[in-house]
A protein has these predicted regions:
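Helix-to-loop junction immediately C-terminal to a conserved catalytic motif
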Residues: 55
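The feature captures the beta-strand-to-loop junction immediately N-terminal to the Walker
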Residues: 40-42
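Catalytic Walker B motif of ABC-type/P-loop ATPase nucleotide-binding domains
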Residues: 165-168
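H-loop/switch region of ABC-family ATPase nucleotide-binding domains
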Residues: 200-201
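Conserved ABC transporter NBD signature motif
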Residues: 63-74, 82
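Conserved ABC ATPase signature
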Residues: 140-144, 148
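Conserved ABC ATPase "signature" region
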Residues: 118-136
Length: 220
């Protein structure tokens, strides 16, 4: 793990509706490059809201998100570049997956970045092999099991070679077998030097896995 700060939140405030309570209230946070950070806290404590701010899906009403020391820009071109480097795997994979087949799904994001078809095909093939997706590459996404959908969700992000992957409760609603499978995939990500932020309610796993643990309450 490096001492370099790859992601920083400076006095972040966010509310979903005007005059509503703030989901994030003056959050300050620094994340080191290559670190494994577990986020814990009750539902509604601000974990998911912070994650959505990290890659520009949400824009804070106040404060700054910094990536490599530079404030996030909300112009379309810069946001697309940021989202290629800071990827989110949602708690519910059905919110992320939409293409007909697994292979098409994984190909969509990298092709949207303007990568040449041949290079994209090579990258997709490599990621499918890494995450053991090849056996069901031609299957329709809607026909996959929960664990397989989670594999494809992670592949969606990994194929773009991100610097940060955010996992919002990656083992939620999975049986023990698929939970172990997802945890093994997370270990592979960290072995590649990718910075991983993960929300989890599993205290034992968080303490065993993480370099740092962030405890959130009331958006702080």
């Amino acid at each position: 793990m490096s001492e370099e700060i790859i992601l920083e939140a400076r006095d972040i405030w966010h509310s979903y509706e005007e005059n509503d309570r703030f989901s994030l209230q003056g959050l300050d946070l620094k994340v080191k490059k290559g670190s494994k950070v577990a986020f814990m806290g009750a539902n509604g404590s601000g974990k998911s809201t912070f994650f959505l701010c990290c890659n520009g899906i949400l824009r804070p009403q106040k404060g700054d998100i910094l990536f490599h020391g530079k404030p996030v820009s909300y112009k379309r071109k810069e946001l697309l570049a940021l989202r290629a480097k800071v990827g989110i795997v949602f708690q519910d994979p059905d919110k992320q997956l939409f293409s007909a087949s697994v292979e098409q799904e994984i190909s969509f994001g990298i092709l949207n970045l303007g990568v040449a078809k041949e290079q994209a095909r090579t990258e997709v093939e490599q990621v499918m092999e890494e995450l053991e997706i090849v056996p069901f590459r031609k299957r329709p996404v809607h026909a996959l099991s929960g664990g397989q959908k989670k594999q494809v969700s992670i592949a969606d992000i990994l194929v773009m070679r991100p610097e940060i992957i955010i996992l919002d409760e990656p083992a939620a609603a999975l049986d023990p077998k698929h939970t172990r499978m997802v945890n093994e995939m997370v270990d592979k990500l960290t072995e590649q030097g990718i910075t991983v932020l993960m929300a989890t309610h599993d205290m034992d796993y968080a303490y065993a896995w993480a370099d740092e643990i962030v405890l959130m309450k009331d958006g702080k």
